[in-house]
């Protein structure tokens, strides 16, 4: 069985880890970082950039740079790039492809399976969309687990012999979750979960952006939010200011030439104190308190029974957030986990459980929202209450609402409201062929089945006729099998194009390197090379120079090889006479130009440089 990777597919950043020798290891990406920005950008020539290189050019290419796509998972939202619509699943798949490639480079083998984390408060549509994204990226998603639960796995792996209750406070780039767990004897049991899928670091950035924009507007009468490029610069500055204020009491926001009017160019030079930052983001911090109260209430425990507080997500580095959690719980949060990496580490641990590498660990998660069906009068009748341990299955008998009714439409809903219309409809299906009878007589058994991924299947059985209908919930906002297959093929096509681009960069780089080394060596060898031999080398050298900027890669490779062989023959002759090593001719090494001899990191530096040059 191949390696199963654990992926934290985040709103702003993503991370991947794997089990090695019984220990989870965070995989460094091709840029040398342990996290990858969840950013995708499309270039004018159709090239696609993912991660740090995409984020770097977002200011100059705001219209074709996609950020925080996770906030739209499970919705009908589309991204229009040059007339082509991309779903959130397809954009997320591009990030996953990059993560998959980095993992394969690290492991030296193909990776086809993964455990992916989602916010605990993600509904069924959002979870299914995440699985679809994995499939498009060429990954079989073996398990979807909740982010706070993954963090608890990372925290508790070496503490399995003790029994204690923990609260996981997870404030990421785009979502907020809080989970109450009980750890003991290798069992990780989620007692309750709550959260807000529209609260995260992006919202803190937005508050700072609005503050800067309003201050500038008051002074200059110009609203920078109407200018896309200025807006992108504002966002970058706001995020930087937020990060700096986590360790400093004041930061300077300096954006020269942010815009211009009839009087000339305009600049931003603004000091932002931590106190002001806390003031403008106070409501966001307070929004995280109520979910904590609800989670404790649902778990039927008091705050005094919580022994450990774990902070997860980059936004928990904000001092006001830490202070709010401390004030609410009366305890100092634990410093035992890395907030940026622990979710991916936990996912890798779960992957290890699936492969058998991690033993004696049992994970008992819960469904975050109540599941039920719409009944007479539009009432939402619950079958599975929120915070029920999964996997689970539950059945209930219903009947018809009218005389001689021969079919029923079953509307599956998810949420906590009393009326069906106020909850999210996950899907509808019809049970036909019911024998005509007075209302209330037919017995229709509705069964809900939730798997370990939190994905729902619903069936209805007419106990009188034996007729049955069922549905695996795939909301209308998700992709059908045909759309997923199409997206998979496009993703493979992109991967092939990326491979060709990289091959081109390596080929051109090898040619340039060889030309430089050959000219340098000829100069250093001087008269030691006969005129005849020098003419032969020069002929091959000029032939390579003539075609190296063309599109025929095979011809360039052939010319590179011919020059390598010709010069090696000449240098061998020179150094044989001197009793030396031909590979030291003027520092010349015939293998140095070969891509196979370059370190992976060097390849990536060249790759990035090539892309940046293209943008100019």
Curated annotation (Swiss-Prot):
- Cite the entry's keywords alphabetically: ATP-binding, Chaperone, Nucleotide-binding, Phosphoprotein, Stress response
Which residues does the annotated region (Disordered) include?
579-605
Lineage: superkingdom: Bacteria
Q: Name one GO molecular function term.
A: ATP-dependent protein folding chaperone
Tell me what turns on expression of this protein. Answer: By stress conditions e.g. heat shock.
Question: Matching CDD domains, A to Z?
Answer: ASKHA_NBD_HSP70_DnaK-like
Identify one Pfam family in the record: HSP70
Tell me if ATP-binding is a UniProt keyword of this record.
Answer: yes
Post-translational modification Phosphothreonine, affected residues: 175
Q: Which InterPro entries match?
A: ATPase_NBD (IPR043129), Chaperone_DnaK (IPR012725), Heat_shock_70_CS (IPR018181), HSP70_C_sf (IPR029048), HSP70_peptide-bd_sf (IPR029047), Hsp_70_fam (IPR013126)
**What's this protein's family per the entry?**
Belongs to the heat shock protein 70 family.
| Protein purpose | Acts as a chaperone.
The protein's name in its UniProt record: Chaperone protein DnaK
């Amino acid at each position: 069985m191949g390696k199963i990777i654990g992926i934290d597919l985040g709103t702003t950043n993503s991370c991947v880890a794997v089990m090695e020798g019984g220990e989870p290891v965070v995989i460094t990406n091709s840029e040398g970082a342990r996290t990858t920005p969840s950013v995708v950008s499309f270039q004018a020539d159709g090239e696609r950039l993912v991660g740090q290189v995409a984020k770097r050019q977002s200011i100059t290419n705001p219209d074709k740079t996609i950020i925080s796509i996770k906030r739209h998972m499970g919705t009908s939202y589309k991204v229009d790039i040059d007339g082509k619509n991309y779903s959130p699943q397809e954009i997320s798949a591009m990030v996953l492809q990059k993560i998959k490639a980095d993992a394969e480079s690290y492991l030296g083998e193909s990776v086809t399976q993964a455990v992916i984390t989602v916010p605990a408060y993600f509904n069924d549509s959002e979870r299914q969309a995440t699985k679809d994204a994995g499939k498009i990226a060429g990954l079989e998603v073996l398990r979807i687990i909740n982010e706070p639960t993954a963090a608890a796995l990372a925290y508790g792996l070496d503490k399995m012999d003790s029994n204690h209750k923990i609260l996981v406070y997870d404030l990421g780039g785009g979502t907020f979750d809080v989970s109450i767990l009980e750890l003991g004897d290798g069992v990780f049991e989620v007692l309750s979960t709550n959260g807000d899928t529209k609260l995260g670091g992006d919202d803190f950035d937005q508050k700072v952006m609005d503050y800067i924009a309003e201050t500038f507007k008051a002074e200059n009468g110009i609203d920078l939010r109407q200018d896309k490029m200025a807006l992108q610069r504002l966002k970058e500055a706001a995020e930087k200011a937020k990060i700096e204020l986590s360790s400093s009491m004041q930061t300077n926001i300096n954006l020269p030439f942010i815009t211009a009017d009839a009087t000339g160019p305009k600049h931003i030079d603004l000091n932002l104190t931590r106190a002001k930052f806390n003031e403008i983001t106070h409501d966001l911090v307070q929004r995280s308190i109520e979910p904590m109260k609800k989670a404790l209430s649902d778990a039927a425990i008091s705050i005094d029974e919580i022994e450990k507080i774990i902070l997860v997500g980059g936004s928990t580095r904000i001092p006001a957030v830490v202070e709010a959690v401390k004030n609410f719980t009366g305890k100092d949060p634990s410093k035992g986990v890395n907030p940026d990496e622990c979710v991916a580490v936990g996912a890798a641990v779960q992957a290890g459980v699936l492969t058998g590498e991690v033993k004696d660990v049992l994970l008992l998660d819960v469904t975050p929202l109540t599941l039920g069906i719409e009944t007479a009068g539009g009432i939402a009748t619950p079958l599975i209450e929120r915070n029920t341990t999964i996997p689970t299955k539950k059945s209930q008998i219903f009947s018809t609402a009218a005389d001689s009714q021969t079919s029923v439409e079953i509307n599956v809903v998810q949420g906590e409201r009393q009326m069906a219309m106020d909850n999210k409809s996950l899907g509808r299906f019809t049970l036909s062929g019911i024998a005509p009878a007075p209302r209330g007589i037919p017995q229709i058994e509705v069964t809900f089945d939730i798997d370990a991924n939190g994905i729902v299947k619903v069936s209805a059985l007419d106990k009188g006729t034996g007729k049955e209908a069922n549905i695996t919930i795939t909301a209308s906002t998700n992709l059908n099998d045909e759309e997923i297959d199409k997206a998979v093929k496009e993703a493979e096509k992109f991967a092939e194009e990326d491979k060709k681009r990289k091959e081109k960069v390596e080929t051109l780089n090898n040619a340039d390197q060889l030309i430089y080394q050959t000219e340098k060596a000829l100069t250093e060898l001087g008269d030691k090379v006969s005129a005849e031999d020098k003419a032969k080398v020069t002929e091959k050298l000029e032939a390579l120079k003539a075609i190296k900027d063309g599109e025929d890669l095979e011809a360039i490779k052939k010319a590179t090889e011919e020059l390598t062989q010709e010069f090696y023959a000449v240098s061998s002759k020179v150094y044989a006479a001197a009793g030396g090593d031909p590979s030291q001719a003027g520092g010349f090494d015939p293998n140095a130009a070969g891509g196979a001899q370059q370190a992976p990191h060097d390849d990536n530096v060249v790759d990035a440089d090539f892309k940046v040059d293209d943008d100019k």
